[in-house]
Structure formats: C-alpha cells, structure tokens
C-alpha cells in the first residue's frame, strides 16, 4: 500500500510539473526582462535582495515579489543562494552565464523570442492540428491570421526580435562548426548562405576563412534588417525562384521549415547553383534520434512540434534526410555531429 501511495504521489507530482511547465519559461523571461543576471554579474559578487532592488529599472520595487521570483530561480538552479555575514545573497549558477550580455553565447534573444506572447500562441492550437478539419492552415495561421513569413514582414518589431533570437542560436552553432569542421571548407572560394537572415552565420565563416567570398541571401525585409557587415555581400531574393551560384551553398535551419516536396525543390535549385566539380550543399539542421539519451533529445523533439505548428515543417531522422537527399537527385552525403543541437550534413550533388 505504501509503495502504491508513493507511486501515485510521484505520478501526480510529475503531472503537476507538466501542468505548470510554462512557469519555468515565463519566470526565466521575467528574469531577463528585469536584467537580474547582468546586475549580479556587473556587481561582481552575490547581492542581497535590497541591493538588487536598487538596480531594477523602476522604483519602488515589490520586494516580496522579487524574493519569491528569486526563490524560484534558485530552485531552477539558475541562481544561487548563500548566507554571507548573516545576510542572504543571490549569485549566478553556471547556466546563468548564458544570460549575461556581451559574449557570443548569450541567449537573451532566443529567450525573448520563444517566450513572446505571439510566438507562444500557436501552441494553443496543437489539438486542431491533429483533428484535421480539411484545412491546410498551420497553427500559426489559425492563431494569428496569417502565415509566419507574412507576419514577420508586417511586424518589423517582431521580425527584429525573431532575427535577434536566430542570431543567438546561430552564434552557438557556428562557434562549434568553425572549430570542429574546418576541413569542410577546404577548396571553397565562394559560399552563399541561403535564408541566412542578418548574416551572422556566414560572417563567422568570413572571419575564420578570410579567403572565402561570403554572401547572405534572404528575403528583402530580412536583408533590410541586416547590420550590413563589411565582410559579407548581401543579396535579396526568393530561394524558390533563384539561388546565386557558388562553390558551396549553406542552409542553416532552413529545410526544417518546409515539407518534403518543398525541400526537394529547394535542394534541386541548390544543386543547379554549385559546380559539378567539387560543389556541395552544407545543411545545418537537427537529426532526430528518439532513442538517444543525449541532453538535447527532448529539445529536438520540442523543435519538431514547433516546426509543425509554425511553418508546417518538421525535424528529420537520418533515414528521412537520406531519402530527401536521394529524391533530390544527389549522389551522397556525410553527417558530422557537432557540439550543438544541430548536426552538419554535407550533400554532394555530383
């Protein structure tokens, strides 16, 4: 009887944690909005509640509310709590370093993008995606009345937030790619980053390999929001209509936005854009392995649902990637796993 009660208690606790799972995301969002990690980091040592209060963006501060949020952040193991000279002080646990501004692995943009009210809205339409009413609309379209691409073009402030979030993710990926896959760029003199956003990814390549002429290629409203890095060229266009020629075409987190038919169309255009002698397409995307015990497995499965809801796309297993590349008329591929959520697929058209 005692064992059954313990099992019930554990099961109920698990369900309650699922029910309130959103709390972790939104408490994290509030910590970012209040700039708590940067305040403590800039102070140089753990801070008391009253010290933290004095540095918040507006006064007066509800210290009881702040205390309770900090208590939750400590339980999340993002912040630390210690007693120094008889006073309770709050510091930063290791994961909180990714909340500190000013370094290439800062994740603030990604946090604010993913927890934005509009970007969370499609998750409320997951049921409708399963009980298909004959509609081809994505959950994003059901929630916000338009597809994600038109929404971004019509809401420049959200587009900027989205681009900042993607740039955060890109910096994490490209840091690993450049360090762990440098031989991938041997023999390449030109590369085009298709759907490359504001140019963060290809700029990392330009810095690491100055001899490579790097170009970012994306929609006009995306290029318009680009900082205009001097190391790279920018071209506006639509990948379904034209892809500029280069020794290598790179696509980071692009194909997961689309269904198989559209991916094959994109891959065929990429094939036409690279030379027969040594040309290749570099795909940076997730490879699903549901049996894996990797720390990123749950996140990869979450991103698969995210793609389904927002774009109608999907994350793919290696077998699905193999079929996609074969159906696009490519001769072969090579997979390299890197220290990131994504892996690298070198697809060889000829």
From Swiss-Prot:
One of its GO terms (molecular function) is O-methyltransferase activity. Involved in the biosynthesis of coclaurine, a precursor of benzylisoquinoline alkaloids. Catalyzes the transfer of the S-methyl group of S-adenosyl-L-methionine (AdoMet) to the 6-hydroxyl group of norcoclaurine to form coclaurine. It comes from Thalictrum flavum subsp. glaucum (Yellow meadow rue). This is (RS)-norcoclaurine 6-O-methyltransferase. Pfam families: Dimerisation, Methyltransf_2. It catalyses: (S)-norcoclaurine + S-adenosyl-L-methionine = (S)-coclaurine + S-adenosyl-L-homocysteine + H(+); norcoclaurine + S-adenosyl-L-methionine = coclaurine + S-adenosyl-L-homocysteine + H(+). The active site is at residue 256. PROSITE patterns: SAM_OMT_II. Belongs to the class I-like SAM-binding methyltransferase superfamily. Cation-independent O-methyltransferase family. COMT subfamily. Inhibited by sanguinarine. InterPro entries: COMT-like, O_MeTrfase_dom, Plant_O-MeTrfase_dimerisation, SAM-dependent_MTases_sf, WH-like_DNA-bd_sf, WH_DNA-bd_sf. It comes from the Eukaryota. One of its GO terms (biological process) is methylation. Substrate binds at residues 169, 253-257, 306. Homodimer.
């Amino acid at each position: 009887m005692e064992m059954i009660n313990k099992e019930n208690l554990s099961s109920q606790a698990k369900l309650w944690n699922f029910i309130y799972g959103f709390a972790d995301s939104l408490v994290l969002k509030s910590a970012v909005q209040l700039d708590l990690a940067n305040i403590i980091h800039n102070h140089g040592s753990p801070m008391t509640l009253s010290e933290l209060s004095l540095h918040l963006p507006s006064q007066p501060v509800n210290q009881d509310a702040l205390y309770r949020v900090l208590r939750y952040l400590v339980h999340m193991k993002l912040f630390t709590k210690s007693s120094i000279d008889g006073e309770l002080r709050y510091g930063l646990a290791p994961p909180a370093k990714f909340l500190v501004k000013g370094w290439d692995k800062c994740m603030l943009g990604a946090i604010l993008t993913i927890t934005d009210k509009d970007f969370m809205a499609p998750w409320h339409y997951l049921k409708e995606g399963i009980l298909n009413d004959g509609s081809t609309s994505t959950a994003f379209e059901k929630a916000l009345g338009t597809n994600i691409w038109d929404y971004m073009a019509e809401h420049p402030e959200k587009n900027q937030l989205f681009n900042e979030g993607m740039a955060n993710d890109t910096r994490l990926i490209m840091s690993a790619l450049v360090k762990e896959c440098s031989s991938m760029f041997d023999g390449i003199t030109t590369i085009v980053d298709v759907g490359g956003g504001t140019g963060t990814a290809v700029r990392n390549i330009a810095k690491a390999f100055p001899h490579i002429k790097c170009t970012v290629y994306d929609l006009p409203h995306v290029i318009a929001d680009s900082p205009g890095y001097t190391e790279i060229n920018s071209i506006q266009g639509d990948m379904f209509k034209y892809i500029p020629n280069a020794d290598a075409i790179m696509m980071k987190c692009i194909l997961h936005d689309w269904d198989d038919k559209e991916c094959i169309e994109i891959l065929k255009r990429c094939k036409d854009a690279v030379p027969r002698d040594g040309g290749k397409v570099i795909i940076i995307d997730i490879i699903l392995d549901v049996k894996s015990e990797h720390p990123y497995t749950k996140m990869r499965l979450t991103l698969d649902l995210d793609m389904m809801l927002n774009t109608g796309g999907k994350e793919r297993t290696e077998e699905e990637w193999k079929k996609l590349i074969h159906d696009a008329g490519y001769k072969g591929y090579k997979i390299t796993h890197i220290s990131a959520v994504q892996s690298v697929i070198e697809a060889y058209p000829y």
